[in-house]
Amino acid sequence: MAPPCSISSASHLLITASLPKPSLRPPRLPHPKPLPAALLALAAAAPTLPALADVPAPPPSPTQDVQVLEAPSPAANPFSNALLTAPKPTSSAAADLPEGAQWRYSEFLSAVKKGKVERVRFSKDGGLLQLTAIDGRRATVVVPNDPDLIDILATNGVDISVAEGDAAGPGGFLAFVGNLLFPFLAFAGLFFLFRRAQGGPGAGPGGLGGPMDFGRSKSKFQEVPETGVTFVDVAGADQAKLELQEVVDFLKNPDKYTALGAKIPKGCLLVGPPGTGKTLLARAVAGEAGVPFFSCAASEFVELFVGVGASRVRDLFEKAKAKAPCIVFIDEIDAVGRQRGAGLGGGNDEREQTINQLLTEMDGFAGNSGVIVLAATNRPDVLDAALLRPGRFDRQVTVDRPDVAGRVKILEVHSRGKALAKDVDFEKIARRTPGFTGADLQNLMNEAAILAARRDLKEISKDEISDALERIIAGPEKKNAVVSEEKRRLVAYHEAGHALVGALMPEYDPVAKISIIPRGQAGGLTFFAPSEERLESGLYSRSYLENQMAVALGGRVAEEVIFGQENVTTGASNDFMQVSRVARQMVERFGFSKKIGQVAIGGPGGNPFLGQQMSSQKDYSMATADVVDAEVRELVEKAYSRATQIITTHIDILHKLAQLLMEKETVDGEEFMSLFIDGQAELFVA
């Protein structure tokens, strides 16, 4: 009979059975079952080799027979995972312990309560522990914040110890490194960003342009300005050009002025409505002067952080002084140059710090020798008085809207490169565009070119320019609008009423065009050609204002006369607003009321953030307010009666004009005036 086989010898037989050497084949066992099944059973029942080394299995009984190690199922594959299957311990006490070198905390507590953990060893920080089970195996457990853990371990007789170092594993060291790594990286990042802001080592190419360049000026610098604009390209601002040409000549020929004791102007402020060419003049100065040129917008000074505005002003003038003589151009200076001292809000106003620094740089203790400051604004009334005094801005150049001659020159400049028809007359266009700025005229010619291209024309004719003018003034035509015949008739009589009253009012603006084509929010329009002299002077007589109110009410009067009181519409709402505004100004501001007298009441309120009053204050009593309302109503009623008298007297001309409008939709001034030849109309005499 073959000698009994122990578990350890069986494990040896399992290992040798998988080798290809025939000399190591295990001896045949006297068992009726096949050998591979018995070996598979041994592999499933034998513990792992490390466990056998730590806890040696007890020697088998002398009477132990190898048949007790048979596989439970003879159908099992004898070669399935023969080498990869880890042998399991045979001890019943460790049979339900978790596998692996790291246990979950719940598995650890379950094993402790079952008495299967012999000892634990905590790491120094208490975040990990290493356990030793009763079968000798070891595992690690991540320990949460459980205040009852020590009591549970002591109750179940577990030996507790604490490691002197990070004996529990690499987790403690990694945690230590992680705690130091984030502050180090944050500090290094901030250091790198501030080095970039200062332009020092690590600032990158050029040292500037980093994301932390808060305190540096963002002005554009040109050593040799190439703006592409000279004084030849600036038209319609002859007086402004003369003022600036002296500044340019001073830079080019300083000896001519210094020989007579003259000093170069330190600053020049360009003042004028939007679109009059202030920035264009500055570009022309840069193109003519031939000296270094700095340009920036005032809104670039004040941004996100407090103190940035003053810092950027200092940086700008430091660069300019290094390049002196030079020109610094600040566009829209009212963004930082507004009046100080409003004192609202109780906080610090960053704009005040910026303007204080600007005042110091322009004419402070150190001075700004060789730096000429050009600035542009369309709000000179809100600028601080200290900024406007001589020594800072020695000159204030007014760039006003061009007159007829100026508009002709501007149209000639903006028509360069455009194919124009022979019927285009710049003189007529200029007279039809009173009050237009250079930007408006440039837009007019561009819109005319777009219309000509849309119509597949080779040239720009006067029709395209006329249509573009109406588009700019009143909006695009509503070609697809569906208008009933009754509405067209009502609009025709409404516009005819405006034109008829305007034509028969003495010393009023002539009618230029009448149209019932819907444009924008208007169903029809009547164009008048205002006097050039009146626009330039800004002086309006009392009779002109009274005529203006009567003309505005002519549309409503025509509706009432033709369609009756019950069928008038809301089309005159804008006319009423205009009439009320003119009448109230005549009473409150212009002194055209006998009862109120030669006084101005109810002045406009100022903006508190400009250092002015909070709101308008009524400086008159309620009784005076009643008198003002009565005077306004009297002026409006007088204008209404004048318009009614004209329309009822010349109703035949009203019918002819309305019929002509319904047929042609558009009637020009000359065609309209031809109706008066047969009508024998006379001017209205009050």
From Swiss-Prot:
Location of the protein in the cell: Plastid, Chloroplast thylakoid membrane
GO biological process: cell division; proteolysis
Named cofactor requirement(s): Zn(2+)
Record-given protein name: ATP-dependent zinc metalloprotease FTSH 1, chloroplastic
InterPro entries recorded: AAA+_ATPase, AAA_lid_3, ATPase_AAA_core, ATPase_AAA_CS, FtsH, P-loop_NTPase, Peptidase_M41, Peptidase_M41-like
Function: Probable ATP-dependent zinc metallopeptidase.
Superkingdom assignment: Eukaryota
PROSITE patterns (UniProt xref): AAA
Family per record: In the N-terminal section; belongs to the AAA ATPase family. In the C-terminal section; belongs to the peptidase M41 family.
Bilayer disposition of the protein: Single-pass membrane protein
EC numbers for this chain: 3.4.24.-
Record-annotated membrane-spanning stretches: 173-193
This protein's UniProt keywords: ATP-binding, Cell cycle, Cell division, Chloroplast, Hydrolase, Membrane, Metal-binding, Metalloprotease, Nucleotide-binding, Plastid, Protease, Thylakoid, Transit peptide, Transmembrane, Transmembrane helix, Zinc
NCBIfam families given in the database record: FtsH_fam (TIGR01241)
CDD domains attached to this UniProt entry: RecA-like_FtsH (cd19501)
SMART domains for the chain: AAA (SM00382)
Catalytic residues (UniProt): 495
GO CC terms, sorted: chloroplast thylakoid membrane
Cofactor: binding comment: Binds 1 zinc ion per subunit.
Enzyme superclass (EC): hydrolase
List of residues binding Zn(2+): 494, 498, 575
Molecular function per GO: ATP binding; ATP hydrolysis activity; ATP-dependent peptidase activity; metal ion binding; metalloendopeptidase activity
Transit sequence range: 1-16
Residues binding ATP, per UniProt: 272-279
